[in-house]
């Protein structure tokens, strides 16, 4: 709501630790009749310890997001200056999954700064089972391109190329909206 600070990263109110998380995963699995894979997404911070804990919860995959990823939701200091570089996070995450005996049962997915095939090859060579491409794919779709009809500073309050209004449904280039006019 307007005037209320957003908490980013957000905290889920239903769990405070690994035991609560395992219960929540079981609850979701029951609600979906086990038909939907359950993935945990973790920011790369205390990678080894966090992944070890996550691997014991019953999830199907663990998604590690390195500090090179992008989000319009967090303060600039958090998005640009915190976290573990992704390449270092992959080895720690793979070792944690291996150490708890979940190799082959839990997939390791990595995202954060994947820009090209070389980055994909490095991630897989270091132990990722798959990679996710977010920001690069958005840029390839022309996200944040300057459009002559958009008054970014007047309408959005930001300069062209710094929109980050994906969550509003007002994407002026049409990448993150369901509005046919945009």
Regions from the PLM with identified roles:
Residues 1-3:
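Flexible glycine-/small-residue-enriched beta->alpha junction loops
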Residues 9-181:
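Glycine-rich phosphate/ribose-binding loops and adjacent secondary-structure elements
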